[in-house]
A protein has these predicted regions:
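N-terminal low-complexity or amphipathic/hydrophobic leaders
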Residues: 79-95
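Cationic, low-complexity basic patches in intrinsically disordered or flexible, solvent-exposed regions
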Residues: 9, 19, 24, 28
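Catalytic core of membrane glycerolipid acyltransferases/transacylases, capturing the structured
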Residues: 95-112
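Extreme N-terminal basic, low-complexity initiation segments
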Residues: 2-9
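Short, Lys/Arg-enriched N-terminal segments with co-localized hydrophobic residues
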Residues: 18, 31-35, 40-51
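Divalent-metal-activated hydrolytic enzyme cores
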Residues: 49-84, 107, 116-140, 151-244
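Functionally engaged cysteine thiol sites
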Residues: 14, 91, 150
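Short beta-strand segments
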Residues: 89-91, 113, 143-147, 229-234
Length: 244
């Protein structure tokens, strides 16, 4: 059964701890142990069971049963190395599951996510991802994907006492400035929503501009080894469309 120890779930059978490299599937806990479909506060425990982590491990059990095992050949190939064709730069928003909305298989997308799908200029973390993707993985396409109802974009309108978020969002502030210089101040909720949509899409274009400031990427684009694309995902409709 699943037991909670040091805030982690371990699998015990016959009183012995199974090694981490065990090839056995994780078995669901006995029926009636807890209601897997119920909503519990984060970190809540019922009779020693870590509900949040248990849900993730049960999800992995289903993944191995319905996806990994039927496609074992594909996953064994990936175990020896990756060869993605696309670097995907997206937002960290939990409502967007990149592989799910694109139906991309494991191994097809090399993914970098952050708040606001931002390409910071002269950032070591981002530069490392970009260099590895372009120089070593030799991706053919780089995608920057924005989305509707983006909290990062809406935060551009608010004062904040946060230590890090405002500094990070300075990388997107120019998108807000551009749109506000083109349109009248919104007077209705619909107009306000449209303004945010325009800023979200302008931000994608701005981040493409930032991307092109990296010499290794610009060189790859100039030599036609890499193409850059701007996409926008609508949370309300599920539609993903090209905007740049």
């Amino acid at each position: 059964m699943y037991l909670c120890s040091n805030d982690q779930l371990i699998l015990r059978q016959g009183g012995r701890r199974q090694p981490d490299h065990s090839e056995r599937f994780l078995e669901p806990p006995p029926k009636g142990e807890y209601n897997a479909g119920a909503h519990y506060p984060h970190g809540h425990r019922v009779r020693g069971v870590c509900i949040v982590i248990d849900k993730l491990l049960l999800g992995n059990f289903r993944f191995r049963e319905t996806d990994f095992t039927p496609n074992i050949g594909h996953y064994r190939e990936l175990a020896s190395g990756q060869n993605p064709e696309t670097l995907w730069i997206g937002c960290s928003d939990s409502r967007i599951q990149t592989g799910h909305i694109t139906q991309a298989r494991a191994g097809e997308l090399f993914i970098q996510r952050n708040i606001g799908n931002i390409v910071p200029v002269h950032d070591w973390n981002f530069a490392t991802v970009l260099e590895y993707a372009v120089v070593h993985l030799k991706v053919k396409d780089v995608v920057i994907c924005g989305h509707s109802n983006c909290g990062a974009i809406r935060a551009l309108d608010r004062e904040s006492n946060d230590s890090y978020i405002p500094l990070w969002l300075n990388n997107a502030r120019e998108a807000k400035t551009r749109i506000d210089s083109r349109i009248q101040a919104p007077e209705t909720v619909r107009e306000a929503d449209e303004r945010y949509r325009l800023i979200e899409q302008e931000n994608v274009k701005l981040q493409i501009e930032h991307l092109m400031t990296y010499p290794l990427l610009k060189k790859a684009v100039d030599e036609k080894r890499v193409e850059v694309h701007g996409l926008y995902y609508d949370l309300a409709t599920g539609e993903l469309k090209k905007i740049a």
